[in-house]
């Protein structure tokens, strides 16, 4: 194959692989991601404020494979697939102060948690 068609083919393959992905999804792993949060003091919104907090977003490694013979025997041949996975989770938190604007031009404050660091860790149904 001549050189020019090979280069064109590689460029087209590169476009096909990366099209439709945002920069964040193109980077493997688990990363901090900012999002806007609105805090209200009560259901009526007597005091409220907003803050950019951090979440953990991304993907981590997982795998599934046929179980070993010893696992099959021990499970009565019911556990024929063994899987292992990790989930993107918050590894540490920090408190941040949110300033609230209240009715009557009063001001208040409230502390909320935001992610400080993220990591791939054992998947859990619920941590809280």
From Swiss-Prot:
Single biological process term from Gene Ontology: cell surface receptor signaling pathway
GO cellular component: extracellular region
Main location: secreted
Lineage per the UniProt record: Eukaryota, Metazoa, Chordata, Craniata, Vertebrata
Protein name: Glycoprotein hormone alpha-2
Summary of subunit composition and partner proteins: Heterodimer with GPHB5; this heterodimer interacts with thyroid-stimulating hormone receptor (TSHR), and hence stimulates cAMP production.
This protein's UniProt keywords: Disulfide bond, Glycoprotein, Hormone, Secreted, Signal
Sugar attachment sites: 36, 80
Disulfide bonds: 30-88, 47-102, 56-118, 60-120
InterPro entries: Cys_knot_C, Cystine-knot_cytokine, Glyco_hormone, Glyco_Hormone_Alpha
Family: Belongs to the glycoprotein hormones subunit alpha family.
Summary of the function given for this chain in its UniProt record: Functions as a heterodimeric glycoprotein hormone with GPHB5 able to bind and activate the thyroid-stimulating hormone receptor (TSHR), leading to increased cAMP production. Plays a central role in controlling thyroid cell metabolism.
Residues in the signal sequence: 1-20
Native organism: Mus musculus (Mouse)
A molecular-function term among this protein's GO annotations: hormone activity
Gene name of the encoded protein: Gpha2
Annotated localization: Secreted
SUPFAM superfamilies assigned: Cystine-knot cytokines (SSF57501)
Tree of life domain: Eukaryota
